[in-house]
Regions:
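Cysteine-nucleophile active-site neighborhood
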Residues: 267, 291-367
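Amide-donor transfer/coupling interface in amidating biosynthetic enzymes
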Residues: 182-229, 234-238, 350-434
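A short helix->loop->beta-strand "cap" motif at the edges of active sites that frequently abuts
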Residues: 113, 169, 313-317
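Phosphate-binding active sites in nucleotide-utilizing proteins
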Residues: 239-313
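Intrinsic, low-complexity polybasic segments
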Residues: 438, 450, 459-460
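Internal gly/pro-rich beta-alpha loop/helix module
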Residues: 125-233
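ATP-dependent carboxylate-amine ligase catalytic core
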Residues: 2-111, 119-142, 155-159
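Short, low-complexity intrinsically disordered segments enriched in A/P/G/S/L with frequent Arg
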Residues: 441-442, 463-465
Length: 466
């Protein structure tokens, strides 16, 4: 019989984006952390920016949960492991509660986590009650804890909102409209946590405001069942992977880096903006981020541009995602028209747009196997390169992203979720494919890997083999 773990948990959702879910989730996390509790926070969907804020608020790593990209079993593993160490689990939803396929509501219902609805009360009175009732009753089998009003003006305003609730809906309180606790944003979402010098001040202020006006007792405990756990094969044993990490390149999934380590890789981090050379590495990973905000500085670091060109010329593996791909192009032009010449390994140019260019989950059939991920960008790229593959959106979202390849270099707008297919990822990073995958194109744990060399990483390893 699988073991059961119990932990108080709640999913923070809203009728739409921009209601203040992240502010409320971060405030709850910081409040309970300040009271001495261990808080684990998760984020629904593929977002990178909200987890950075939530990590600062909780003091613990934040991972994504998604019934499609992450998968049911891997989501179950992450929650079960958190329940074994935490006093409280918080899950921040994505978009509106019922938006998307799968939605935040789908995840809450599947794992039995009650929903706390956050509604922006600005310029609203009795209509608040109608929105709250809709969130609670639209899907009758959805566990619903109650509602919290955000951006409330006065005590009288809060009383009007509370008085609008019907059918026994629970009122969790009101968070005031204070600029000191709001989190600033830009074109891809919230500003990165590392760029906010006063972030801890904002988080503590939000926690104090929440404590003074809202119900903040621990929610009821939720049962979390143990997942089916497989073992990671050491397909990257001893492989040294250099990972770009600075204010221009910060969009990495914690679960993806965990997987690389579990497969035996040794990770080292470097800054394409400040460092003049790459770390000693067999392979290179350029994740997404905000290169458009730093493209002039990136262009001026000619030593790093030369080092990356040399890495590719040596026939070493290189994976570049979204902003990492833009860095490899001939040039990048920002919305103000400032053009900077970059690495030049991919023949083409990119221009930033003021409007969204693509937003979609992506399923990509690569030569190495099927990988899942997502795309979200404001740039348009022009190139004559022929893609080796194109992504498909499982729910009709905007974007059928190309994947380009030159030698051992693979580049795409897609942010890949590595645990969706570990052996495909290993093939992308392995320095010598012949040695790494000789006689084991379809490896199995029992047939290939000695038991003493295995390490647990979770049920996500059920993914397709190349």
């Amino acid at each position: 019989m699988k073991s059961i773990r119990h932990c108080p948990a709640v999913l923070i959702a809203a009728p739409a984006s921009g209601q203040g879910k992240t502010t409320v989730t971060a405030a709850l996390a910081r409040l309970h952390r300040n009271q001495g509790r261990k808080v684990r926070v998760f984020k629904c969907g593929p977002d990178f920016l909200d987890p950075m804020i939530l990590e600062r608020a909780s003091g613990a790593p934040v991972y994504q949960l998604d019934m499609w990209m992450v998968g049911e079993q891997e989501s179950r593993r992450l929650l079960w492991e958190a329940a074994g160490e935490a006093d409280l689990i918080l899950i921040e939803g994505v978009m509106g509660l019922f938006d998307g396929t799968p939605s935040s509501a789908d995840l809450a219902r599947h794992f039995g986590v009650p929903v706390l609805g956050v509604i922006d009360g600005t310029a609203m009175a009795q209509t608040f009650g109608a929105l709250a009732l809709g969130l609670a009753k639209y899907q009758p089998d959805l566990p619903f804890a109650g509602v919290l009003a955000n951006r409330v003006g006065t005590l009288r305003h809060a009383q009007l909102l509370e008085g609008s609730l019907t059918e026994g809906l629970r009122w969790y309180g009101a968070l005031s409209r204070e600029t000191g606790i709001e989190l600033p944003s830009r074109h891809l979402g919230l500003v990165q946590a590392s760029e906010l010098n006063d972030l801890d001040v904002r988080l503590d202020a939000a926690a104090d405001a929440l404590a003074s006006s809202c119900e903040v007792a621990l929610p009821p405990a939720v049962e979390f069942a143990a997942p089916d756990v497989l073992e990671a094969e050491p397909l990257l044993a001893g492989v040294r992977i250099a990972v770009a990490r600075d204010e221009a390149f910060a969009f990495t999934y914690g679960a993806s880096l965990d997987l690389l380590r579990a497969m035996g890789a040794e990770l080292s981090f470097f800054s394409p903006i400040r460092d003049t050379e790459l770390p000693e590495a067999d392979s290179l990973y350029l994740p997404g981020g905000y290169p458009e905000l730093h493209h002039v500085a990136l262009s001026q670091n000619t030593s790093m541009l030369t080092a990356i060109r040399a890495h590719h010329a040596a026939g070493k593996p290189l994976l570049a995602e979204c902003g990492g791909m833009l860095y490899l192009l001939d040039s990048l032009t920002d919305v103000e028209g400032t053009r900077a010449e970059l690495v030049g390994l991919l023949a083409g140019d990119a221009v930033m747009q003021k409007r969204l260019a693509a937003l979609a989950l992506q399923s990509v059939e690569m030569p190495e196997g099927l990988l899942r991920g997502h795309t979200y960008h404001h740039s348009l790229t022009s190139t004559e390169l022929e893609p080796i593959a194109r992504g498909l959106s499982p729910n009709g979202g905007r974007g059928a992203e190309a994947v380009y390849r030159e030698g051992r270099m693979t580049a795409s707008y897609v942010h890949f979720y590595f645990p969706s297919n570990p052996s495909a990822i290993a093939a992308l990073f392995a320095p010598d494919l012949k040695d790494a995958f000789a006689s084991k194109l379809a490896p199995t744990v029992d047939g290939v890997v000695p038991e003493e060399m295995r390490s647990p990483v979770g049920a996500s390893l059920l993914a397709k083999r190349p």
